[in-house]
């Protein structure tokens, strides 16, 4: 029997390549890792040391989710067919590659959510960031993986847990695409990601379930996870902090990755407040900032004064 694209009928037309291959497989088509090692001994041995292997070696798993064949498809079909059918993650489209991973990782996100995500729409797949086989030869890696591997660590960044199976530390890996954000961490004030006290994923969700949204939560809710004292509730709330300005929240005033101004501010002058309070710039007391002069000292909110003045 032919597998893959050659075996697709009308009923199978909406299935991914991986789903088609497993849908047609019979129990006798699976041979176990030992059969794979006949040709791929080094790869099988390296994979046995990976966190992934500890899970897929569970004998309680169904055949189609066990060992090498759990990802690459039934082994006897690959060995016997004149046109060998196998799931090769470096030769599939990003959508097909992600669909193969999501057969087991559906709890991370659904295929529908993945297709709508920013990473998917940028042409990435799971193996763009995750290395399933330890020490995969460079010529078998995706172009993005080669780019990440070739890049020296941007900073002394915190190592991710080995169970994440990332190709590099988060700052280096994310920076291989988001270089402009990495450069912001070189500014005078920045969140302590380069120092290893934070990770990109402390704020960003690499597996988003809200379309193009890559932050863990709304801007305000995400920030107050750490900056609890700024969250209120206050008797008199400042509109940006209250989240009433189109969802920008804290970002109306702060630049989260890095800034050359104190306190991660977008500007350290009266012009910061003047973005919204234009009418106050010409007829107010002079001063470098509206708060350092000792007037509006509670910009996040106040329980005593609606103009956020000092008590």
Can you say where each PLM-predicted feature lies in the sequence?
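Short sequence/structural segments immediately N-terminal
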Residues: 2-311
